Every structure is written in C-alpha cells, then in structure tokens.
C-alpha cells in the first residue's frame, strides 16, 4: 500500500447524505424562510441542498491514504489540505465499525488509535468491509513486526495474522440482567417520579387519605397500575438497549492481541494488543449483585486522555462467566482467578467506623431537618415516614460498604475493592504501576488511615485503596513494586 489509495466509490452516496444531516438546521431554516412562504422559486432551497452535497463529494475526492515506511498517512482537503501521520509502533488500537448505512452498502470504517487523543486518531471512513478487515490484520501484523523486528533494514517481512481462538460469545438470555444495572434502576426511578406527579396533593397527606375513599381508591389503583406499566416498560427498554448494543458480542484472542466484536445496528470491532491490557475491573452494582451477575471491563494502557481507558469486555452476565473471562485476561497463557476469588485483607475497625459514619451522617442530617420542621408546621406524614426509612437504609449501606472494603497483593496483581451501590473490584498488574500516591485528610490522620493510589497509564489513571492503615498500605506498595520504592530510599517497615 505504498501508493495513495482512494476510499470506495460508494462513499459518494454516504458523504453527501452525512453532510446533509450536518446541515439539517440550515436546510430547515432555508425552507421556512425561503420562497415557499413568499410564493417564490426554489433557488435558495436548491442551493442549500447543493452546498452540503458538493462538500460531501469534495471530501471523498480529496481523501487519500497509504501505508509506507512504517507509518500510516491520511491526506484530505482541497482549499486547506491536511496530512495526518501515525507511526506503526505507536498504534494502540484498531477499531472497525459499520453503521446500518455502511452495512447496507458493504462498507466499514477503520479507526486507528495512537494514544495521542481521540482528535489525533486516523479514521478511514469508506473502505469495503473485506478490505477493512484485511487492513486491520495487516496493521496489527506490522505493529507486532515493528515492535519485535531487529534494527537492521533487512528484517523479515511481517508475519501472517495468527489464528484466533474464541473466549466468549454473548448469550442473548443475559439481557435479563439489563434492568438490574444502574441505568435500568435510574430509568425506573425516573418513571416512578413522573407517575407520582399524577397523584392529587391530598394523597400525600395521611390525614386526608380517608377523604379519597371510595372513589379516590380507584384513582390510586389506576396510578399503581400506571407505575407498574412504567416499570415494565423501563425493563423492556433496558433489555432492548442491551441487545442492540451487545448483539452477537464475540471475544477472541490470538497470541498477541484481543478482538471484540459487537453491535446490532452499528457493528464495532476493537482490537487491542495483549501487552496493553493492564488489568480488569469487575463492576458489581447492587442490582446485579442481587441477581448474581456482574460486568467486566479491561484496563487498557496507552489511550489518550479524551478516550475511554476501560474497554467493556463482558456486559452484565452471570458472575461465573465474568470471573472466567477475567481469569483468561489476567492469566496470560494460563487462566487464573485468584485475584478475583481470594479473600481480601480488611482495613480494620477504624476504616469500618469511617464507612459507617459516612453513610449515616447524611441520614442523621435529614432526620434533624425533618424534626426541626415540626415547630415550623412544615412536617407532613409522608416526610416523617421517609425519614424513618432513611435511617435503617443508611445503616445497611454503611455495613455493606464496610464489608466491601479490602485489598490484596496476589500473584503480582494489586487488588482493591470498595463501594456498595456501585461496588467494584479493580485488579492491576504490578508491572503497570508507574508510581504511588499517599493521601490523607485531617480525619484520616486522626484514625491512622490513608488513601493509597497506584498510578497507571490505563483506565482512570489510578487504582485507589481507600481508608487503609498507613503501615498496611506501605507494605502493600513495597510488596508489589519493591524496586520502585527502593529508588526513593524506602524500605519495608517492620511488622506491627
């Protein structure tokens, strides 16, 4: 591909349509303010359509790409020509996507991620689908060759793409977990809030409930049916959204890379080098935990700050499935689930007290406000009931947060778990830790606790170990990265 290549001619259909979509507000304005309202001609309307169509055609005619001397080049533009270059040894990801229109025309888009930010990625929009796959394989093969080839100019040609083996294929039945995700719960709560607006004001006063009978109870029953219908609708929408986003999800692995394919209306294929996977994140929001499910994300290093450093490998699925895939990601040539199943080291009574206090304090403040409103004649029976329910809920939340808190150094991995409503377990390879940060607030210092942060180049850029005793945190850091701490003159403290 040393010569400049043009995109597929079928993009002459896609590009003008895309430009028309971008110019839609202008087109509507021209239609409303044009000759139709004055009984004139169609000149302005035709011009408003012709301009974006011409821009789309010009975009296609002036776009070229090539692969030459270890780099990918993309050239486009007529009046203002731009040339974008990506070195093959800096390619981090190769994504192949195809919208519904692209799939109808047999086209695909190749997006080459370089780690310099989403705006610096190279996007080849309009390749034939087989050509896009060939380019993806060629790029990944050349990337591996550039990374491992000797320095001399007579290096061997890039090896053929290795055989891939399947790791996971989506079971459509897993869509039953979609309503239990955070998005599903929020949607249900929103629909419940909207439905509650239909209640008359008297329904919120316990002393007026007898006045609603008997006709009022029929109204309440109607509202209850509406709330139930809204809940069912939100569950159905969550299931449909799950299937559209993750349809035919397939995760495969070769000796050097992982490949993830998913999507119904828009298919997306993401390829990531194995060396870029720094760890995993097992997300266990409360709803999924109660349903015996979880979600798995992979921590990917080398992505730009504007990109998402956590790639979803497994959408909400049975916990056993999530643990199996996570073990395959962490275990390299042999699956391992020790960082996922081993008991975690607790953080002691001081950390437990902080978890309980942080959960209970807002509830106590709310109850205090409700109590103070008694004298001001602002208290309603429903607000009193709410205040009484908040206290036990806060106590349960604090206990669950305390049980969830823990850490572990297992088989060269840093393991940290925290949270309750959105609990997650983060597993990070020690070789991907590039630094440590110790933070403590005034309240933490009084309890002898710190927040230990492992800095990394992937995901959220850090893995936090919350409210860990200072001695335990330093021992954990020294156990995972002894050389890193030795560089700053730190030695493992004696046991206490």
Residue ranges and their predicted role:
Residues 1-496:
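N-terminal basic, Ser/Thr-rich segments that initiate or prime the first beta/alpha elements at protein or domain
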